Amino acid sequence: MTQENSAKFSFILVVFLGMLTAITPLATDLYLPALPIMPGELNTTASNIQMTIGVMTFGVALGQLFGGPISDTMGRKLPLITGNLLCVISSIICAYAPSIEILLLGRFLQGLTGSVGVVIAKAIARDFAFGQELTKLFALLMMVNGLAPVIAPLIGGQLLLFTTWRVIFVILAIFSAILLVGSLLFRESLPKEKRVTGGVATATKNYITLIKDKRFLGQT
């Protein structure tokens, strides 16, 4: 591989990982300007609409707990494909939700599946980079993760000048579809000989151990 091709590949990789990192904050904050107008259309209360944020946050937390162990066992590519495909579907569910109950379901699934990409993006970074390069790559991903929540409401507000909140979720579905294509083209970065056994079962045992540890809970 020539230096030019290596640089090009590295740029493509960084863009892909950055997009994976951005999907969760974008899905969280892009529709925030629409919160005041959503209760009337869905015939519900403002507090129920605000629950869509909390439900997604719970999904994100759950997905981050198990996304990493799954990718360590199965590799990076298959969980990425599955997560992004389900994120497309969940975004469509949100876009066409006829009721608050369906919207809450879609938001939970959106958080659960979108967070898988965020976790795996960091794992892929560790697969490809080491030392100072890894530090720089993590810094870039953290910058994207920090900028997305700031920019997303501004973009969402501008979109609402021309369209409805449902289109915002359609845009998120398109964004996830682009990530799905990227996942299909992505070359597996974790060889079979480097994968671990146990996966979710081992992770669950570790989480239970931490929950039972009074010293750990005392520091949280």
Whereabouts are the PLM-identified features?
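Extracytoplasmic
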Residues: 12-46
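Helix-loop junctions at membrane interfaces in 12-TM secondary transporters
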Residues: 10-11, 96-106
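Conserved MFS/SLC helix-loop-helix module at the cytosolic interface between two early adjacent transmembrane helices
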Residues: 62-101
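Cytoplasmic helix-loop-helix junction between adjacent transmembrane helices
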Residues: 106-147
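Residue-level signature of mid-helix packing/kink "hotspots" within the transmembrane helices
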Residues: 29, 57-65, 149-150
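Flexible cytoplasmic inter-helical loops of multi-pass small-molecule transporters
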Residues: 184-208
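MFS-fold secondary transporters
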Residues: 90-95, 106, 110, 126, ...
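Helix-loop-helix hairpin linking two adjacent transmembrane segments in secondary transporters
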Residues: 98, 102, 139-184
